[in-house]
């Protein structure tokens, strides 16, 4: 399919868009097969499409419990879609091409660069190989650690559970197979289990900081000054977005819990909105403030060039840096002694406005259609567009139009706002002439 799309001379953005759409379509058809469900009847088109979109877009929102509804075949299809979605369709296509010994063209290398947010085309094949090795290594290590918990509890089935949850966590998907204990229960039965909590949290964070950040850490170790500005911004922002919410949850949401459980719940609840979707606490029991904070974290999401979705940590950081620059009457925003490029600011503002607008619009429509509280619906749309998967429990009972809204938001959230814009709009080639400049008073 990759070669066919390139032969049609499509832009990188359109190849990425059609690539994800193609995998979703194939996954939908596979999930509709009779042996994909435990009833032997196959899933209805709407449920299959929703599940396939959620898996490929590594979201985790579900309309049927994964463990109790889908057969072993159906679960395997879902896991494969999670892996493809987490790695990226183009990265998977590149891996297949490299494994077959075929040469990757310059145009294909350019598409790979856009797909993984690499700074340059040079060395892109080697960098892709580094990404693939890293993904397999972290997922394997995560599975081995989880096996020490799941095999004693579930027997040999624990091997499958460990592999499934390791891949789902690393790819920031949030799909789980714990519905055999209680449908839609996620990881609530392991809320006070340190091994499960720490392993899942580490996989989520590592998968969500971005492949370029991996490379910086590998090459430069503890030498912070040698890191790219982007890696510094990602690591600093990630640290802040993990620490501050954890402190809030510790003091205001889980204060009645025993100390060890309280610490684990607080940490997990600050990590999982970073587009993972697992939960160890009952989210409906959170206060409205806690739910609103979670919505904000879900919208920000992970970092560019990672397995995570959302508007990205760098987008939030750039906008905050520019606001600070305005307060201090500086011409440009700054990070670590470097100015932020004007194009970066424009892109960040465009992404922010697109995500906020669609998040609000989707929430208002669902609230009207379903006659549900607006905060509950905004929680759902933030989870979808941030490709998170956390829910207040309303997803399975939504009407078709509400599910279609969530499907659209999940797809946009995974491919990215700018990718969608570039894929659907033609570039303006008239760059030589400029219109007259006139100032407008704002604020």
Predicted regions and their residues:
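Membrane-proximal intracellular helices of multi-pass ion channels
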Residues: 1-443
């Amino acid at each position: 399919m990759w070669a066919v799309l390139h032969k049609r001379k499509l832009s990188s953005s359109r190849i990425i868009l059609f690539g994800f759409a193609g995998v979703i379509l194939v996954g939908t058809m596979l999930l509709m097969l009779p042996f994909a469900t435990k009833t032997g009847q196959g899933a209805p088109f709407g449920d299959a499409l929703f599940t396939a979109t959620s898996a490929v877009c590594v979201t985790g929102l579900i309309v049927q419990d994964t463990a109790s509804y889908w057969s072993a075949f159906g679960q395997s299809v879902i896991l494969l879609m999670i892996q493809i979605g987490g790695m990226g369709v183009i990265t998977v296509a590149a891996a297949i091409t490299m494994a077959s010994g075929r040469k990757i063209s310059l145009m294909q290398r350019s598409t790979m660069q856009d797909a993984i947010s690499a700074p340059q085309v040079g060395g892109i094949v080697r960098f892709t190989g580094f990404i693939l090795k890293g993904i397999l290594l972290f997922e394997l290590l995560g599975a081995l650690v989880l096996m020490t918990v799941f095999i004693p509890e579930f027997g040999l089935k624990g091997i499958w559970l460990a592999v499934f949850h390791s891949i789902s966590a690393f790819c920031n998907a949030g799909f789980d197979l714990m519905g055999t204990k209680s449908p839609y229960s996620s990881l609530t039965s392991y809320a006070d289990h340190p091994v499960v909590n720490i392993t899942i949290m580490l996989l989520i964070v590592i998968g969500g900081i971005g492949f370029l950040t991996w490379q910086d850490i590998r090459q430069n170790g503890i030498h912070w000054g040698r890191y790219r500005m982007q890696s510094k911004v990602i690591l600093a922002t990630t640290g802040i977005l993990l620490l501050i919410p954890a402190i809030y949850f510790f003091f205001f949401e889980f204060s009645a819990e025993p100390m060890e459980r309280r610490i684990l719940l607080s940490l997990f609840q600050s990590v999982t909105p970073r587009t993972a979707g697992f939960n160890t606490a009952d989210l409906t029991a959170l206060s409205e403030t806690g739910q609103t904070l979670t919505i904000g974290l879900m919208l920000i999401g992970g970092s560019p060039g990672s397995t995570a979705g959302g508007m990205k940590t760098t987008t939030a950081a750039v906008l905050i840096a520019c606001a600070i620059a305005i307060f201090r009457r500086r011409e440009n925003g700054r990070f670590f002694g470097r100015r932020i490029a004007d194009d970066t600011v424009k892109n960040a503002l465009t992404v922010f406005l697109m995500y906020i607008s669609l998040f609000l619009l989707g929430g208002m429509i669902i609230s009207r259609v379903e006659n549900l509280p607006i905060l509950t619906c905004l929680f759902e749309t933030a989870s979808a567009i941030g490709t998170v998967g956390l829910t207040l429990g309303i997803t399975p009972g939504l009407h078709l139009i509400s599910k279609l809204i969530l499907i659209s938001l999940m797809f946009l959230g995974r491919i990215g706002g700018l990718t969608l814009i570039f894929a659907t709009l033609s570039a303006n080639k008239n760059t030589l002439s400029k219109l007259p400049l006139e100032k407008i008073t704002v604020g």
